[in-house]
Regions:
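Extended, charged catalytic domains and RNA/DNA-binding interfaces, predominantly
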Residues: 170-175, 179
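Enzymes and membrane/adaptor proteins characterized by extended Gly/Ser/Thr/Asp/Glu-rich
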Residues: 39-63, 67-158, 180, 185-192
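Boundary/entry segment of secreted carbohydrate-active catalytic domains
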Residues: 1-37
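Extracellular/periplasmic catalytic domains that process cell-envelope and extracellular macromolecules
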Residues: 19-22, 42-43, 70-72, 169-171
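Substrate-gating cap/lid alpha-helix
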Residues: 161-162
Length: 192
């Protein structure tokens, strides 16, 4: 009975120490060649990692081993896969066009299908969260336009593409992270 009670208590966050709670909320950046060095922190309950740098060719195998070392096999593995210049795993997933290019050449339905296909590649590698899409508006002359990191200038149209990308990722089993707003691009009043 005491053993069973300890087991129940260890899975209940209300019974966790502040250190354990904080570690589960941490997302640490790891360069592709440093996956082994993070293993001790993962064993102690680090909540997740964000992949940076050039990924090793055996990334899926390394991530599976890393996840297996996590308490309860719980490790959030994230990558930043917006497309264009912000894409960390190109060597393993292939290139994704910029959001600007997607907005020019695809419908929202095609965007969702593309994100689903790309999300399946991420999932196969062991990536469960994509730090994309960018929700900022494409504003002529801004970084979002220059770097191709936004779909559209019109808020409603942009929102359709952002939602389609997120739905595609999520259908593939990868969590999407809508980001940057109120943002660095042109934004509308988010309170309306």
């Amino acid at each position: 009975v005491a053993s069973l009670q300890r087991s129940v208590d260890s899975t209940d966050p209300a019974n966790w120490s502040n250190t354990k709670l904080a570690s589960r909320l941490m997302l640490v950046g790891v360069y592709g060649n440093g996956l082994g060095s993070i293993k001790p922190a993962v064993r102690k309950g680090l909540g997740g990692i964000v992949l940076f740098g050039t990924p090793p060719s055996n990334l899926a195998k390394q991530l599976a081993a890393l996840r297996a070392s996590a308490p309860g096999d719980r490790l959030l593995v994230s990558s930043d896969e917006e497309g264009g210049m912000v894409q960390r795993l190109t060597r393993l997933t292939g290139k994704m066009p910029t959001a600007k290019r997607i907005g020019q050449t695809m419908t929202p339905a095609q965007t969702q299908a593309y994100a689903y296909s790309y999300g399946k590649r991420l999932k196969a590698l062991g990536v469960g969260t994509n730090l994309a899409p960018v929700a900022d508006l494409k504003y002529p002359g801004s970084w979002t336009d220059r770097d191709g990191r936004a779909y559209k200038t019109n808020p409603a149209a942009n929102g359709r593409y952002v939602a389609a990308f997120a739905r595609g990722m999520q259908a593939a089993g990868v969590m999407a992270t809508v980001k940057h707003w109120p943002g660095g691009g042109a934004v509308v009043d988010t309170h309306k």
